[in-house]
Every structure is written in C-alpha cells, then in structure tokens.
C-alpha cells in the first residue's frame, strides 16, 4: 500500500546519469525550495513507461512553472536509463532505484512483477505518483497494480497548482 497523503516523505539519495556523468540526487535538497513529483515506473525500454516519460518531456516547463521538479524512478541501472533516455529523447531526470529500496519505502514495490509470466521479479516499482510539498510532506499519492495504467496527470497538475 502506498504511503498516505500527510505522511513525511522518506528521504533518499539515488544515482542518475547526466551528460556530465553520474550524479547523486537527494530528495531533501528540494525541501524548502521546490515541490517534487516522483513518478515510479516498472522498467525502461517498455511501451507504457516510454509513453509516460516521453509525454512528460514537452510538459516539463509547465511543471517548472508550478515550482516543481520531476523525477522518474525505476530499478534499472543508471546506464540503461541513460541509453533509454537518449534513444527516446526523454527529458525527465531518471533516478536508479537499483536495489528497489525506495520503491519499498514508499510502499509501491511489487511482491512479484507479472507473476503469470513467472519472471521471478520482486521489488519492481508499481506505476505510482507522489507529489511532495516544499516541507517534505506527501500531498498526493497514487499507485496502480496495473503496469499499463498511467497516473492521473490532471489530478497531479491540480495539486501542484494548489501548492504553487
């Protein structure tokens, strides 16, 4: 079950790969400055995940205008995320939760991803969204067991506009 609205967001530091090289992103660096949109997704190089991240790229200025920073989080390693980002021209900062700790801390890790296919993949992130305010408190939370269901971006934008 995902963390509830009103809960203090668990802090984390995760790696990302930028054009300048590897970099560590710490969630709490945004506290006191910016709202944060965390978008957990199962895996890079998959259809719905590509659709989600690619559709966000042209909308990033809108999120910046709402005083929000956007991070995509998956269990892929940062080099795979970078390759996917370059191939698909994804502008969202992608963070690697390679050990699935952050997905577990936020209550959005599958016990078994696609069990009907016997993939044996525990810990994969469910498609989820969290809006965290400048005080580090979760103001919006959404998670789906259906990896094909995109988050409700209208509700996310409405919450961010409210927090602006």
Predicted regions and their residues:
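Chalcogenol-based redox active-site neighborhoods
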Residues: 1-164
């Amino acid at each position: 079950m995902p963390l509830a609205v009103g809960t203090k967001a668990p802090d984390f530091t995760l790696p990302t790969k930028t054009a300048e090289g590897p970099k560590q992103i710490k969630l709490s660096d945004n506290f006191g400055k910016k709202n944060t949109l965390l978008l957990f997704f199962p895996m890079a190089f998959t259809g719905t995940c590509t659709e989600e991240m690619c559709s966000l790229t042209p909308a990033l200025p809108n999120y910046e205008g709402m005083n929000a920073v956007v991070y995509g989080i998956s269990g892929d390693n940062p080099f795979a995320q970078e390759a996917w980002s370059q191939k698909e021209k994804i502008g969202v900062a992608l963070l690697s939760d390679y050990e699935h700790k952050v997905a577990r801390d936020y209550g959005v890790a599958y016990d078994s991803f696609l069990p009907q296919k016997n993939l044996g993949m525990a810990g994969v992130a469910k498609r989820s969204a969290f809006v965290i305010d400048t005080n580090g408190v979760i103001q919006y939370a959404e998670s789906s067991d259906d990896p094909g269901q995109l988050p409700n971006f209208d509700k996310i934008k409405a919450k961010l506009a409210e927090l602006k």
